[in-house]
């Protein structure tokens, strides 16, 4: 139980606590008198966000990785998207091995599409088709989809849809 007594600029705070024993604790607190300058409204300062969007994506990806694990029977299909390229890997997390991979840097995809502004939805569909064919050749039919913290729309959605159309089960 805390009580405040005093007048003017000095107050005495008495604290009786059973947690600290039955003794009383006193401490003096010096209070400032009200001034007109402290009551004036202050201008609102808008501060920048502390995290960037890429840091937010990495945080989302770490939360996803806690839930999505690749096994030998059902490896993880991991997607990484940069401004210029799109990368996909099928990973067995128990053995820490990459079983299959596809990217826009591979010759069949890069020669077929002449893109200068980065991967488009059509390019993402082609990468999904290539990874699905590569997985089916190696006997992998079921995968756990790891979108890498990216929203499930646009290139990520097109890649997943193309992989499903060509035989991969998510």
From Swiss-Prot:
Belongs to the universal ribosomal protein uL18 family. Residues 1-47 form a transit peptide. It is found in: Plastid, Chloroplast. Binds 5S rRNA, forms part of the central protuberance of the 50S subunit. The keyword rRNA-binding applies. GO terms for molecular function: rRNA binding; structural constituent of ribosome. Signal peptide: none annotated. HAMAP family: Ribosomal_uL18_B (MF_01337_B). One of its GO terms (biological process) is translation. The keyword RNA-binding applies. CDD domains: Ribosomal_L18_L5e. It holds the Pfam family Ribosomal_L18p. InterPro entries: Ribosomal_uL18_bac-type, Ribosomal_uL18_bac/euk. GO terms for cellular component: chloroplast; chloroplast envelope; chloroplast stroma; cytoplasm; nucleolus; nucleus; ribonucleoprotein complex; ribosome. This is Large ribosomal subunit protein uL18c. Part of the 50S ribosomal subunit; contacts the 5S rRNA. Its main location: plastid. It comes from Arabidopsis thaliana (Mouse-ear cress). Keywords: Chloroplast, Plastid, Ribonucleoprotein, Ribosomal protein, RNA-binding, rRNA-binding, Transit peptide.
């Amino acid at each position: 139980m805390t009580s405040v007594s005093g007048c003017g600029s000095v107050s005495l705070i008495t604290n009786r606590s059973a947690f600290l024993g039955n003794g009383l604790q006193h401490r003096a607190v010096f209070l400032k008198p009200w001034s007109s300058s402290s009551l004036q409204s202050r201008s609102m300062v808008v501060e920048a966000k502390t995290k960037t969007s890429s840091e937010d994506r990495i945080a989302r990806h770490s939360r996803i990785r806690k839930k999505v694990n690749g096994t030998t029977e059902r490896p993880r299909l991991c997607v990484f998207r940069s401004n210029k390229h799109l990368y996909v890997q099928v990973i067995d997390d128990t053995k820490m091995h990459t079983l299959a991979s596809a990217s826009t840097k591979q010759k069949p995809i890069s020669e077929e599409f002449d893109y200068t502004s980065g991967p488009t939805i059509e390019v993402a569909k082609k990468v999904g088709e290539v990874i699905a064919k590569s997985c089916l050749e190696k006997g992998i039919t079921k995968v756990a989809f790891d979108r890498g913290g990216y929203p499930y729309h646009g290139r990520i959605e097109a890649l997943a849809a193309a992989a499903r159309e060509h035989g991969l089960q998510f």
